[in-house]
């Protein structure tokens, strides 16, 4: 345990600093959480959800996986979405990828990666659908463009889930957004695919099938 003692020390220092800045900080956290936002992002350790959008603990409900995917057979992700919509009553769902994503890069490689290859298969489908455009780009630009297309694909997948469809049918206020985060400057690039109704899906498909300017 010697190699992680510094983490315990860091935790103690962090807790003390929080109380010093705000004596009621932890008292508020004990109550029921009521975030207005669900963040579905990549597991990459360089993409800290709360910090990126300047939100404190309790203000952002977070789910992360490799390459920020929403897959209809992933009960972990689907359970998070259902809980966020039905129990927490979130008003916005943010699908957030990041440029230079290792998962997206791995999906483009021909060498095997073991179990993760099954997880990345949907990204390869996105590549095949946009191969004509992507094959004209250099390696870095190709990865970054696929990161953008993957986010838009996940917005589409999320909008098709029963939980989202039912919320819209009930007239609930729920908007899905697609962003891509830049590691080199800390800014998010809005893919302009926000959708808040079944009818709004037409705009998402329109953006998905036209060439977008690269972020930044």
Residue ranges and their predicted role:
Residues 1-35, 67-91, 102-216:
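Divalent-metal-activated hydrolytic enzyme cores
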Residues 18-59:
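N-terminal short beta-loop-beta anion/metal-coordinating cradle
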Residues 48-76:
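A glycine-rich, hydrophobic loop/mini-helix early in the fold
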Residues 40-42, 64, 94-98, 177-182:
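Short beta-strand segments
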């Amino acid at each position: 345990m010697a190699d992680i003692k510094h983490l315990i020390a860091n935790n103690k220092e962090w807790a003390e600093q929080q109380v010093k800045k705000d004596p009621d900080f932890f008292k508020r956290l004990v109550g029921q959480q009521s975030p207005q936002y669900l963040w579905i992002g990549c597991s990459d350790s360089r993409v800290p959800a709360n910090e990126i959008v300047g939100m404190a603990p309790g203000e952002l409900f977070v789910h992360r996986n490799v390459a920020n995917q929403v897959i209809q057979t992933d009960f972990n992700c689907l359970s998070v979405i259902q809980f966020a919509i039905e129990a927490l009553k979130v008003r916005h769902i943010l699908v957030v990828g990041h440029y230079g994503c290792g998962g997206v890069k791995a999906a483009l490689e021909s060498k095997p990666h073991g179990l993760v290859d099954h997880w990345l298969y949907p990204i390869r489908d996105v590549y095949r659908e946009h191969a004509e455009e992507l094959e004209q780009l250099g390696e870095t630009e190709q990865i970054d463009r696929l990161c953008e297309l993957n986010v838009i694909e996940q917005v589409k997948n999320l909008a098709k889930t029963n939980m989202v469809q039912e919320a819209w049918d009930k007239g609930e206020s729920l908007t899905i957004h697609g962003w891509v985060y830049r590691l080199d400057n800390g800014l998010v690039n809005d893919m302009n695919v926000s959708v808040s109704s079944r009818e709004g899906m037409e705009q998402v498909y329109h953006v998905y099938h036209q060439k977008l300017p690269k972020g930044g």
